[in-house]
C-alpha cells in the first residue's frame, strides 16, 4: 500500500518488477500462490519526487503492469481515508526470504571468522619461524664479519711490522748517506752527442723525458758524488715520509677495525633476553654507511698494497744506495745501464705510439672512404626524392585549376599536401645530414693531415734515438768497473755547489790535455791552472778561460 508523505527509500514503497520468485520455498511448507503486488499511486503522483506536492506536478503516466500480473484486479482509485482496509507491507515469502538471508549471513560471518582465526594462527607461526631464521642468519653473518675483521686486522698488523722494520732501515741509510761523500767520473762524449742529436727532435717530441734526464746526469757527472748522495738522501727522506704516511694509514685502519670488532662482538653476543636491548625508532630508515663489503675489503687491500709498494720503493732506494757505496766504476756502469734502459723504454714507447698512429691513420682513411660513399649516396637520395616532390606539387597545382565548387578540400587534397610536407621534410633532413657528413669529411681530412705530421715527427724521433744514439752507445765501454778521478777537495770550498762544465770539442785554450782527442771532461788539466792539474779539464775547479761552442751544451776548454 502507498502512503502519502513517505520517501522512496522504504523497501515497501518501490515498484516491483516481477512477481516470479527464483528461490524455492522452504521445505515442508505449502506452496504459496504467486501474486503480483503493484503499489497504488494517486493521480498526479511522481515516483522520483514523492516529497513534492503532487497537485503542482501532474503527469499523465500509465502504470505498467507485467504480463503475469495482468489478471490481478487493480485496487480502485479512491482516497486512503475512504478505504475499508489497508494492504500489508510484506508477503510471507518476503519474510521467509529475509530469515534465510539472515541465517546465511550469520553462517558466512562465522565461516569468515573461523578462517580468519586459522589464518592468523598460521601467520603468527610463519612470522615466528621467519624471525628466528633471520636472527640465525644475522648471527651467522656477524660471525663471518668478525672472521673477516680478524683476517684483515692480522694482515694489517703483519704489514705494519714489516713497514716499521723498513722505516728503521731507511733511517739508518739516510744517516749513512749524509755522512758519505764520493766523487765519480764517467765518459761524456757519447752522452753529449746523444743530447745534441736529441735536440733535433721536432714538435711535441722535444720533451724532457727520462732519457733526457739520464743523459744530463751523465753530462754533468752527476754534479758530484756529494750532491748525488744528498739527492739520494732527499729521495730517501721523501720515501720515509711516504712510508710514515702508509704507516699512519695502516695504524688508523687497525684502530678502526679494532673498534668495529669490539662493536660487532657485542652485537654478536646480544640475545632477545639481554638487558641492554631497547627500541631505537627510525634507526632502520637512516642509512649512515659509507662503504659496501667490496669497497671495505678494497680499502684495507689498498692500504696493504700501498704499504707494500712503499716497502718496494724503499728496497729499491736502499739497493741503489748500496750500489752507490761500492765503487766509481760500478756507479758509472749503473748510470750507463739506466740510460740505456731509459732509451729502450723510450724507443719502445715511440714504436708503440707510431704503430698506434698508423693504425688510427688507416682507420681515418677508411672513414674518409665511408664518408665519401655516404655523401654520394645522400646526393643520390636527394635527387631521387626530388621527383616525387615535383610530381606531388604538380598534382596539387593541377588540382587548383578545378572549377567552382569542385575546388574541394577532399581526401586526395589532404594526402597530397601531407605528401608534399613529408617529402620536403625528408629532403631537408637528407640535406642536413649531407652537410654534417661533409663537415665530418673535412674533419677527417684535417685529422689525417695531423696524423701524417705526427707520424713524420715520430719517425724522426725514432731514427734519432734508435739509429743514431743507440748505435753510438753500443761502443760505450762495457766493463762494469772503470777507473776515474776522485778529488777530496770537491764538496768543500766556493765551488762545492757549482755544476761541472764539460767540454764537447778539442782543446783550444792554454790547458795541456793528455792526448790529441777531445777533452770531454775526461782529460786532466796539465797547465798552470789553480786546480794543479788534478781537476777535469773544463770543470768548475779549472781556472782556464773557456769559450762557448756547439749548440750551447758545454764550453770548450
Swiss-Prot record:
Q: Which family does this protein fall into? A: Belongs to the tektin family.
What Pfam family is a match, any one?
Tektin
Effect of inactivating the gene: Male mice are fertile but show lower fraction of motile sperm cells due to a significant proportion of cells with deformed flagella.
Protein's cellular compartments: Cytoplasm, Cytoskeleton, Flagellum axoneme
**Naturally occurring in which organism (per UniProt):** Mus musculus (Mouse)
Q: Which UniProt keywords apply?
A: Cell projection, Cilium, Coiled coil, Cytoplasm, Cytoskeleton, Flagellum, Repeat, Ubl conjugation
- Its primary localisation, in coarse terms, equals cytoplasm
Q: What is annotated about its quaternary structure and interactions?
A: Microtubule inner protein component of sperm flagellar doublet microtubules. Interacts with TEKT3.
The residues bearing each sequence repeat, given as ranges, are: 507-512, 513-518, 519-524, 525-530, 531-536, 537-541
Which residue stretches, if any, does this entry annotate as coiled coil? Answer: 302-386
Could you state one GO biological process linked to this protein? Answer: flagellated sperm motility
Name of the protein = Tektin-5
Intrachain disulfide bonds: none
What is the tissue localization of expression for this protein?
Answer: Strongly expressed in germ cells of the testis (at protein level). Expressed in spermatozoa. Also detected in brain.
Q: How is it modified after translation?
A: Ubiquitinated, leading to its degradation. Deubiquitinated by USP16, promoting its stability.
Amino acid at each position: 500500500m502507498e502512503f502519502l508523505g513517505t520517501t522512496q527509500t522504504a523497501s515497501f514503497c518501490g515498484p516491483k518488477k516481477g512477481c516470479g520468485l527464483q528461490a524455492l520455498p522452504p521445505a515442508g511448507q505449502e506452496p504459496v500462490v504467486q501474486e503480483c503486488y503493484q503499489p497504488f499511486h494517486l493521480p498526479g503522483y511522481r515516483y522520483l519526487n514523492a516529497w513534492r506536492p503532487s497537485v503542482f506536478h501532474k503527469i499523465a503516466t500509465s502504470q505498467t503492469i507485467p504480463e503475469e500480473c495482468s489478471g490481478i484486479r487493480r485496487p480502485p482509485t479512491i482516497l486512503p481515508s475512504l478505504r475499508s482496509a489497508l494492504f500489508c507491507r510484506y508477503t510471507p515469502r518476503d519474510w521467509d526470504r529475509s530469515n534465510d538471508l539472515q541465517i546465511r549471513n550469520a553462517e558466512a560471518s562465522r565461516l569468515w571468522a573461523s578462517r580468519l582465526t586459522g589464518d592468523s594462527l598460521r601467520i603468527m607461526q610463519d612470522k615466528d619461524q621467519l624471525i628466528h631464521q633471520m636472527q640465525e642468519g644475522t648471527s651467522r653473518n656477524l660471525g663471518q664479519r668478525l672472521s673477516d675483521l680478524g683476517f684483515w686486522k692480522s694482515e694489517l698488523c703483519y704489514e705494519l711490522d714489516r713497514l716499521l722494520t723498513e722505516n728503521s732501515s731507511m733511517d739508518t741509510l739516510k744517516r749513512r748517506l749524509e755522512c758519505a761523500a764520493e766523487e765519480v767520473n764517467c765518459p761524456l762524449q757519447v752522452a753529449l752527442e746523444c743530447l745534441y742529436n736529441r735536440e733535433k727532435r721536432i714538435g711535441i717530441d722535444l720533451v724532457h723525458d727520462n732519457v733526457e734526464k739520464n743523459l744530463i746526469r751523465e753530462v754533468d757527472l752527476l754534479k758530484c758524488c756529494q750532491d748525488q748522495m744528498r739527492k739520494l738522501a732527499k729521495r730517501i727522506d721523501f720515501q720515509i715520509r711516504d712510508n710514515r704516511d702508509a704507516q699512519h694509514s695502516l695504524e688508523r685502519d687497525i684502530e678502526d677495525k679494532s673498534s668495529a670488532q669490539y662493536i660487532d662482538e657485542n652485537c654478536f653476543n646480544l640475545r632477545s633476553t639481554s638487558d641492554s636491548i631497547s627500541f631505537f625508532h627510525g634507526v632502520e630508515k637512516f642509512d649512515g654507511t659509507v662503504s659496501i663489503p667490496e669497497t671495505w675489503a678494497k680499502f684495507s687491500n689498498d692500504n696493504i698494497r700501498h704499504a707494500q709498494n712503499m716497502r718496494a720503493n724503499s728496497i729499491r732506494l736502499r739497493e741503489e744506495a748500496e750500489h752507490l757505496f761500492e765503487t766509481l766504476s760500478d756507479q758509472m756502469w749503473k748510470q750507463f745501464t739506466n740510460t740505456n734502459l731509459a732509451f729502450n723504454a723510450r724507443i719502445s714507447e715511440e714504436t708503440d705510439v707510431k704503430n698506434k698512429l698508423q693504425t688510427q691513420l688507416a682507420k681515418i682513411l677508411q672513414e674518409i672512404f665511408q664518408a665519401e660513399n655516404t655523401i654520394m649516396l645522400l646526393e643520390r637520395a636527394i635527387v631521387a626524392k626530388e621527383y616525387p616532390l615535383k610530381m606531388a606539387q604538380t598534382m596539387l597545382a593541377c588540382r587548383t585549376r578545378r572549377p567552382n565548387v569542385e575546388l574541394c578540400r577532399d581526401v586526395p587534397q589532404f594526402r597530397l599536401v601531407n605528401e608534399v610536407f613529408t617529402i620536403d621534410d625528408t629532403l631537408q633532413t637528407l640535406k642536413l645530414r649531407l652537410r654534417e657528413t661533409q663537415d665530418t669529411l673535412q674533419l677527417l681530412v684535417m685529422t689525417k693531415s695531423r696524423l701524417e705530421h705526427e707520424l713524420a715527427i715520430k719517425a724522426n724521433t725514432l731514427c734519432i734515438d734508435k739509429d743514431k744514439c743507440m748505435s753510438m752507445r753500443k761502443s760505450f765501454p762495457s766493463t762494469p768497473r772503470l777507473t776515474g778521478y776522485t778529488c777530496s777537495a770537491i764538496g768543500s770550498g766556493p765551488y762545492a755547489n757549482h755544476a761541472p762544465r764539460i767540454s764537447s770539442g778539442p782543446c783550444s785554450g792554454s790547458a795541456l790535455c793528455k792526448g790529441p782527442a777531445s777533452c770531454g771532461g775526461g782529460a786532466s788539466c796539465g797547465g798552470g791552472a789553480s786546480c794543479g792539474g788534478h781537476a777535469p779539464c773544463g770543470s768548475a775547479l779549472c781556472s782556464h778561460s773557456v769559450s762557448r761552442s756547439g749548440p750551447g751544451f758545454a764550453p770548450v776548454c
